[in-house]
């Protein structure tokens, strides 16, 4: 009987995970950009990687928010809400550990982010770094030091500007169509913070209540990249693409650029499937979830 109960619990957990897994229809639509991404999961819908697509006009009632802010003379908030119609957000996370229950942290992050985003849009007209300070602090207080989440959240505008915060996550890559290679962005002084839940936030109003022998995390700052040229590709990914077989196989370093040279003329979805096929040929049977999101400038 215990085994049957365990199987039923796993099935129930699969159902919960499926409800927060992004539908293909949620992929943002931004004028001048072609966006596509998927997770290659080891355990079906239950996964240590997670994507939240934020097409602001689909996720939130921007027009009603704009109307309400204009009625109360919140002109700055109204203007920021209008700007959201020309951009979309993407959150990509990766939970430490490979057990089924580890993915519960992604479900917690999913709900915390969307609830917080709704509040911030209504009050500030934008998603601010303060939301992630609060999320980080709550995760620190409710999970152990070995249970954390790497995360990147960014917003892409129709002109190709990508502004993002990274918490222990692999930094984005840019493939240049003109130079036919992944360009070096190391000289841009991009900032990568500790993973979500590893250190309390020194700037969060409640952060000092959290005791930490390792100290406190500095306030999040926002990085900026620009996908300038026609055909350029911005690449977001989890470490499943760079660390397979206990870190012995790195697809990003060894194969990704060559595959993009071959497939760069295709739409983002077809490029992704070419990369996926090459990745599976490269590593055989993956031992970690792997996620990649491609943003191609038309």
Question: What is the role of each PLM region?
Answer:
Residues 100, 104:
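Catalytic Zn2+-binding segment of zinc metalloproteases
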Residues 1-33, 38-91, 96-99, 110-298:
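Conserved subregion of the PPM/PP2C metallophosphatase catalytic domain
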């Amino acid at each position: 009987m215990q085994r049957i109960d365990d199987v039923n619990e796993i099935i129930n957990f699969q159902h919960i995970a499926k409800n927060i897994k992004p539908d293909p229809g949620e992929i943002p639509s931004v004028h001048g950009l072609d966006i596509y991404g998927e997770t290659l999961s080891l355990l079906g819908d239950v996964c240590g990687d997670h994507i939240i697509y934020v097409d602001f006009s689909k996720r939130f009632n921007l027009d009603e928010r704009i109307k309400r802010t204009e009625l109360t003379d919140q002109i700055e908030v109204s203007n920021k809400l209008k700007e959201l119609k020309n951009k979309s957000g993407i959150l990509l996370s990766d939970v430490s550990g490979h057990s089924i229950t580890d993915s519960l942290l992604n479900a917690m992050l999913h709900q915390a982010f969307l609830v917080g985003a709704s509040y911030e849009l209504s009050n500030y007209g934008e998603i601010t770094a303060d939301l992630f300070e609060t999320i980080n602090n709550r995760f620190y207080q409710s999970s152990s030091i070995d249970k954390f989440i790497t995360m990147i959240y960014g917003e892409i505008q129709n002109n190709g500007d990508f502004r993002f915060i990274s918490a222990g996550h692999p930094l984005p890559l840019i493939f240049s169509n003109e130079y036919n290679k992944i360009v070096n962005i190391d000289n841009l002084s991009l900032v990568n913070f500790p993973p979500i839940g590893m250190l309390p936030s020194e700037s969060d109003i409640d952060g000092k209540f959290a005791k930490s022998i390792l100290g406190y995390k500095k306030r999040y700052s926002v990085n900026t990249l620009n996908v300038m040229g026609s055909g350029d590709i911005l690449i977001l990914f989890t470490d499943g693409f760079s660390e397979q077989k206990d870190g012995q196989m790195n697809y990003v370093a060894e194969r990704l650029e060559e595959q993009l040279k071959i497939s760069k003329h295709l739409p983002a979805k077809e490029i992704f499937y070419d990369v996926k096929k090459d990745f599976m040929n490269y590593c055989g049977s993956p031992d970690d979830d792997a996620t990649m999101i491609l943003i191609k400038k038309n």
